Amino acid sequence: MKFVLLFGVLLVTLFSYSSAEMLDDFDQADEDELLSLIEKEEARAKECTPRFYDCSHDRHSCCRSELFKDVCTCFYPEGGDNEVRTCQQPKHLKYMEKAADKAKKFGGKIKKWFG
């Protein structure tokens, strides 16, 4: 009985050690892969299109605001037949950014009071 118990403890120890090494290998591989993807993205990055500027050449080139990326929006200006595409921020995202900004400011005030 002691032999079975000793063998079981040894088996569990070896299994946990091998799985921990495998996880470390996976973490290192994921980290290396992530770094290479970031380097490729930085090399591929180009200048973004500012808000309210024409984005018809590339609809995915709109700049990011503080939290969200602007969207290339198509519309017809009043009294015109030509379609216009500009980078704009949707209203619901604008309101979410304002709420997040107010929450951040309020959090700073609380930190001053109790910090």
Swiss-Prot record:
Disulfide bonds: 48-63, 55-72, 62-87
Positions of the propeptide removed during maturation: 21-44
Tissue-specific expression: Expressed by the venom gland.
Native organism: Lycosa singoriensis
UniProt KW Disulfide bond keyword: yes
Secretion signal span: 1-20
Family statement: Belongs to the neurotoxin 19 (CSTX) family. 01 subfamily.
Record remark: domains: The presence of a 'disulfide through disulfide knot' structurally defines this protein as a knottin.
Subcellular location: Secreted
Xref: InterPro entries: Spider_toxin_CSTX_Knottin_CS (IPR011142)
Predominant localisation class: secreted
UniProt keyword list: Disulfide bond, Knottin, Secreted, Signal, Toxin
Organism classification: Eukaryota, Metazoa, Ecdysozoa, Arthropoda, Chelicerata
One Gene Ontology term, aspect cellular component: extracellular region
Annotated protein name in UniProt: U3-lycotoxin-Ls1u
Single GO MF descriptor: toxin activity
